[in-house]
Amino acid sequence: MVFRIIRTNYAFFLPYLLLLIVVGVLQLTRSQEQLMQWVNVRNAPAADEFFPYATYLGDGVFFVIVCLLLAINNRRIGLMAFASFALSSLVSLCLKQFVFSNSLRPLKTFEHSTYQYHIIKGLDIHSYNSFPSGHTTSDFALFGMLALLDERKGRGWFFLVIAALTGYSRVYLFQHFVEDAYVGSIIGTVSTVVVYLLMYRWVAQYQKKDRPTV
């Protein structure tokens, strides 16, 4: 069933797999500091304006709002989306608070560095609980779910682009390392697939025309 979902939603999962491979190889051949500097040096005024807003697409409040909007059309679809949010958030929170509670964010890690990092003025940047990225976890869970629910499967790449940009924003804004966003994306995507597998038949029974396509 998992392979069937991946095959049906190829427009999302194929480019996502390629993204995982490319970024994974980069992490094997470069340090997190090098990757951070690579992203940081590629800053621009337009990006400084864009990413502080784009990053809110990974905020839990935004996820809940989308769940409520989905519930207006189909209550069970809304509940399934919320279950994805709950599972992905729970996994991310447990890792942050109990397993990797001492993980430092870039600001704290490089506070004595001689390298002049570009940091957007007025931005509230955190220092602790870096791994994994909660925003990236939530946004991949959300847009992964939207890709699965969309009957026009060819648009899956669109949801992936939005999710990837939101994840990239966490590194650009100096809130997370690449590895934080990388693992967060996996947690979010896997959580959505698990919830979808467990609940899509239940959703289909409620209103056949709103049945998630597998």
Question: What residue ranges belong to the model's regions?
Answer:
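N-terminal transmembrane-helix/juxtamembrane module of multi-pass inner/ER membrane proteins
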Residues: 1-63, 96-123
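Interfacial segments of alpha-helical transmembrane regions
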Residues: 7-15, 66-97
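Aromatic-anchored segments of alpha-helical transmembrane domains
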Residues: 22-26, 86-95, 162-174
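Hydrophobic alpha-helical transmembrane segments
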Residues: 23-27, 55-74, 135-139, 146-150, 168-172
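Membrane-water interface at transmembrane helix exits
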Residues: 36, 71, 92-100, 147, ...
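Membrane-helix interface segments
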Residues: 46-47, 74-78, 151-157
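Membrane-embedded catalytic cores of phosphoryl/pyrophosphoryl-handling enzymes
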Residues: 114-214
